[in-house]
Each structure stands twice: as C-alpha cells, then as structure tokens.
From Swiss-Prot:
Residues 1-20 form the signal peptide. Chorion membrane (egg shell) protein; plays a role in protecting the egg from the environment. Belongs to the chorion protein S36 family. This is Chorion protein S36. Residues 244-268 have a biased composition (Low complexity). Its main location: secreted. The gene is Cp36. One of its GO terms (molecular function) is structural constituent of egg chorion. GO terms for cellular component: egg chorion; extracellular region. Residues 240-284 are annotated as: Disordered. The keyword Secreted applies. Keywords: Secreted, Signal. It comes from Drosophila melanogaster (Fruit fly). It is found in: Secreted. InterPro entries: Chorion_S36/S28 (IPR008449).
Length: 284
C-alpha cells in the first residue's frame, strides 16, 4: 500500500516536467519543436552547435572575423618602448622640418629608428595595396595586425612580379593597384632595396606570393625578384696542376716544373696549365 502511494506521488510530481519538455499534447509539442528548431536552412543551428559543444563554441560572426593575435608580455613592453620612441620622434622639430626633404636618409627620423630596424626589433612592412604613388614609409607596429605609418618621401618606380604572370611596370598611366599583403622590407642602413611578400599573419590574406623590386630614387639597385641567394663565383688567377696522388704525382709535378723552366722564356714562373696525372700512372 505504501509502495503504491509513493509511485503515485512521483507520477504526479513528474507530470509538469514532462509537459514542459514535450508540450501539453504530443502532436502539438512535436510540431512546435520542429517549428522552433528546424524551420529554414539555418534556424536554430547555433543552438544545436552550442548544446553539442557544451557552450564553448563561438558565434558564427566571431569565427568568420579575422584573427587578432594577442601580444606576449615581452612584446607588449617592446611595443610600449617603440610607442614612446615614436612620440618623441614626432615631437622633435627637426623631424617635422626634414621629414619631407631629400635629406631624409641622414635625418633624425632615420637615425633614431635605423638601429632598432637593423636589429630586428621593429618590423618594417608596406601597406596592403601598392601603387605608383606609394610613399616610403616606416610602419611601427602597435599590435600584431595594427601599424602606425610614418610617411617620408615618394618611392619612384617599382616593378611588380607575380608568379605565373609577366612583370608589371608600375611607373606611369592611371593609378595601378597591386595586392601585396603583407610585404616585408629588407633593410640596409638607410636604404630600402627590396621588398617581398611573407605571410606571417595566420589569416587567409593571400595565397599567391607577390615579389616587388623597389628602385631607390635616381639609382637602380639589383636585387633578385624571389628571395633566393645567388651563388658567388670567383675566377682563379691562374690554373695550376692539382695535388698529385702518391709518388707518381709528385714526380710528374717536378718533371713538369723542370720542363717549363727549361723550355719557356719566362724563367722560373709556374706553368699556366699542366694535365693532371692519372691515378697510379706516370704522366703522359
């Protein structure tokens, strides 16, 4: 008797829970559930994803937005020092007077920042779009994806080369825009001589690399289009017999030197060329 009473009490207590989950009627609750979650191609999709991931899944607009890398504490301190240096540079009257002059390479703007640039403490990059009216700029990073521009002087003509396409000369005509994203300048002291595309930001910015050759105003500086190291060939001053192998090689070398000293009018000078001795065979 008591067992049946307990079952009755539990059934009465569970009735509101079942009604709240499945609706007051089976058919109405089924239709209401489909109308709430499955009407339309994307209706209720975020709710399903949120439930499946335990509330850890980001919203669709947050997933589609570009990734912003948070700087480490060391980089934050370095960026703070760079910002302080930039503010001091902008407040300097000499920089304000010389930033658009022809003597920018020897001005205070270059000397204050060139040391950090050469030591790799500041990343120098170009804008996202490159055209013929591009100004040579120092972009000081205020964050991984944000930079402040210090425009200095015009950068005349550039040649843009993209793999699979002929080089595009950007020096006249209407403004020509070339995507170069992001572009890293390689720096010699006070001279920007080449820029190349290096994808360092983990976002789908550009799949095809674009290499840009930059000309210094009034002077063409040869630099490879692709970031490769060309081999250095050194021409020897004169050809001489290579080191002999064993006693036969030493004997042939001595015989060649003696014949050269006897037969040539140049006296004791070394012979210009001698045939190498075969392995283990006398000279022929």
């Amino acid at each position: 008797m008591q067992l049946g009473l307990w079952f009755g009490i539990l059934a009465i207590a569970a009735t509101p829970l079942v009604s709240a989950n499945y609706g007051p009627a089976g058919g109405h609750g089924h239709g209401h559930g489909h109308g709430q979650y499955l009407s339309g191609p994307n209706a209720g999709l975020e709710e399903y994803v949120n439930v499946a991931s335990g509330g850890n899944q980001q919203a669709a607009n947050q997933i589609a937005s570009q990734a912003e890398i948070q700087p480490t504490p060391e980089e934050a301190r370095r960026l703070g020092r760079v910002q302080a240096q930039l503010q001091a540079l902008n407040a300097d009257p000499n920089y304000q007077k010389l930033k658009n002059s022809e003597d920018i390479a020897e001005s205070l703007a270059e000397t204050n920042l060139a040391s950090n640039i050469r030591q790799g403490k500041i990343k120098v990059v170009s804008p996202q779009f490159v055209d013929q009216h591009l100004f040579r700029s120092l972009l000081v990073p205020s964050g991984h994806n944000n930079h402040q521009v210090i425009a200095t002087q015009p950068l005349p003509p550039i040649i843009v080369h993209q793999p699979g396409a002929p080089p595009a000369h950007v020096n006249s005509g209407p403004p020509t825009v070339v995507r170069g994203n992001p572009v890293i300048y390689k720096i010699k002291p006070s001279v920007i001589y080449q820029q190349e595309v290096i994808n360092k930001v983990p976002t789908p910015l550009s799949l095809n690399p674009v290499y840009v050759k930059v000309y210094k105003p009034g002077k063409k500086i040869e630099a490879p289009l692709a970031p490769v190291v060309a081999p250095v060939y050194s021409q020897p001053r004169e050809y001489s017999q290579p080191q002999g192998y064993g006693s036969a090689g030493a004997a042939s070398s001595a015989a060649g030197a003696a014949s050269s000293a006897d037969g040539n009018a140049y006296g004791n000078e070394a012979p210009l060329y001698n045939s190498p001795a075969p392995y283990g065979q006398p000279n022929y």
